[in-house]
């Protein structure tokens, strides 16, 4: 199976394979088979629209984890200029599962913080599969307080299965690090915009997710636990993950309907991994618009609005 396609995308993968074969034949024999390639490409696009027009919550959860999906550093490269990464929590070490630093958006200095996963095995291990340890969240907190001091807006990118649950993380007080971030972010006197770009997993996501504006990409998820974890608790088997995903309401559209998410950002046909530049352009446009709106508010109004937003959850 083509690793660029999930199992429910297999009919699309088959068509794309035929298109590639025709292109190779045309290149080798100087044949003009453009009409047939165009016909198959149109058929592929129609099939993609049909499949993606009726995705289940579980299929969206799997898209959110797609191995080719753009990560935080990919979006930084496409959206921002003059990015200067900052390292370390000034207490223990630097956690590569959280990246952050100063950059410019439309010439405006901003602080960027986000989860980062890896692509290859070695990089996945170095990034701890996008699961931060306490030092990652303390690094994020340090950068957020720096942003407040220098009056820079904070833009966070959420993409994690959750905070790392290992013994070493618990020994360094993982829960305290997350709780402290929630406390600090609720009071920061600078605009905060959070965007879920993949998985939004539990407290590991929320630790950089307290904000004035919450965006979700169309095929991202946000939940207190993974569908597999929920299924294992309720049904004693992870095979019920699809049922759990549907019951939990983890998708962007469901969360928008509940008033938790402010904006669902559309993705290119087939998902952000099909056209990362287009996905980044959509995010950039929303960030620019939202930042301009938030910058019009004074600090008292900003904090009061943030407080009311948080207190409205669950009502």
Curated annotation (Swiss-Prot):
GO cellular component, one term: acetyl-CoA carboxylase complex
Domain CoA carboxyltransferase C-terminal: residue ranges: 39-293
EC number(s) recorded for this UniProt protein: 2.1.3.15
Pfam families, A to Z: ACCA
Pathway noted in the entry: Lipid metabolism; malonyl-CoA biosynthesis; malonyl-CoA from acetyl-CoA: step 1/1
Sorted UniProt keywords: ATP-binding, Cytoplasm, Fatty acid biosynthesis, Fatty acid metabolism, Lipid biosynthesis, Lipid metabolism, Nucleotide-binding, Transferase
Subcellular location: Cytoplasm
Disulfide bonds: none
One function term, GO molecular function aspect: ATP binding
EC primary class: transferase
Gene Ontology BP term (one): fatty acid biosynthetic process
Major subcellular site: cytoplasm
InterPro entries for the chain: Acetyl_CoA_COase_a_su, ClpP/crotonase-like_dom_sf, COA_CT_C
Catalytic reaction equation(s): N(6)-carboxybiotinyl-L-lysyl-[protein] + acetyl-CoA = N(6)-biotinyl-L-lysyl-[protein] + malonyl-CoA
Subunit composition and interactions: Acetyl-CoA carboxylase is a heterohexamer composed of biotin carboxyl carrier protein (AccB), biotin carboxylase (AccC) and two subunits each of ACCase subunit alpha (AccA) and ACCase subunit beta (AccD).
Family named by the database record: Belongs to the AccA family.
PANTHER family per UniProt: ACETYL-COENZYME A CARBOXYLASE CARBOXYL TRANSFERASE SUBUNIT ALPHA, ACETYL-COENZYME A CARBOXYLASE CARBOXYL TRANSFERASE SUBUNIT ALPHA, CHLOROPLASTIC
Biological role: Component of the acetyl coenzyme A carboxylase (ACC) complex. First, biotin carboxylase catalyzes the carboxylation of biotin on its carrier protein (BCCP) and then the CO(2) group is transferred by the carboxyltransferase to acetyl-CoA to form malonyl-CoA.
The protein's name in its UniProt record: Acetyl-coenzyme A carboxylase carboxyl transferase subunit alpha
Biological source species: Pseudomonas fluorescens (strain ATCC BAA-477 / NRRL B-23932 / Pf-5)
Gene name tied to this protein: accA
